[in-house]
């Protein structure tokens, strides 16, 4: 059985893609209404609740997460017990868009032009470097156009 941290629509889609391969899934999510619970076993609990993590992890072959906004500490706690893919360090990097883009750039992976904006004074310089039209995103949190 594969464990997925998060029981939203992305977790649900992961499970639907895995079923034709004969895989089964368990989800950990704080909401009893998590939609992934329709397609797999749902453990309701907070990501950092030790009891919920233990119930979730029991009997799993491996763990992954549905998106990058899962608490890194939850991933670290599970990583010590069973295989976690991608590893917690990768999750931590993916949670900061600036760190992620800088990392990819260092590997030679093409990225759109970007400039860090830590305050209003950086915005003008960023627009000069990036040009218009431009997109301003938060460094952390948000997904799929929400708080980005």
Listing of model-derived features with the role each one plays in the protein:
Residues 41-43, 92, 112-116, 148:
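Structural signal for short hydrophobic segments within the conserved structured cores
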Residues 23, 109, 132:
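Short glycine/serine/threonine/alanine-rich loop segments
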Residues 63, 110-113:
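PLP-dependent amino-acid enzyme catalytic core
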Residues 1-102, 121:
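ATP-binding N-terminal substructure of ATP-dependent carboxylate-amine bond-forming enzymes
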Residues 112-114, 134-148:
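Glycine-rich phosphate-binding loop of ATP-grasp-fold ATP-dependent ligases
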């Amino acid at each position: 059985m594969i464990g997925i941290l998060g029981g939203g629509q992305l977790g649900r889609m992961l499970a639907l893609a895995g079923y034709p391969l004969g895989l089964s899934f368990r989800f950990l999510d704080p909401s009893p209404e998590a939609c992934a619970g329709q397609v797999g076993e749902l453990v309701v609990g907070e990501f950092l609740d030790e009891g919920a993590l233990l119930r979730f992890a029991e009997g799993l072959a491996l763990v992954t997460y549905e998106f990058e906004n899962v608490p890194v500490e939850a991933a670290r706690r599970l990583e010590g017990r069973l295989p976690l893919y991608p590893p917690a360090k990768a999750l931590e990097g993916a949670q900061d868009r600036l760190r992620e883009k800088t990392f990819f750039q260092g590997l030679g992976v093409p990225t759109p032009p970007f400039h860090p904006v830590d305050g209003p004074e950086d915005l003008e310089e960023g627009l000069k470097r990036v040009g218009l039209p431009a997109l301003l995103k938060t460094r952390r949190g948000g997904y799929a156009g929400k708080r980005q």
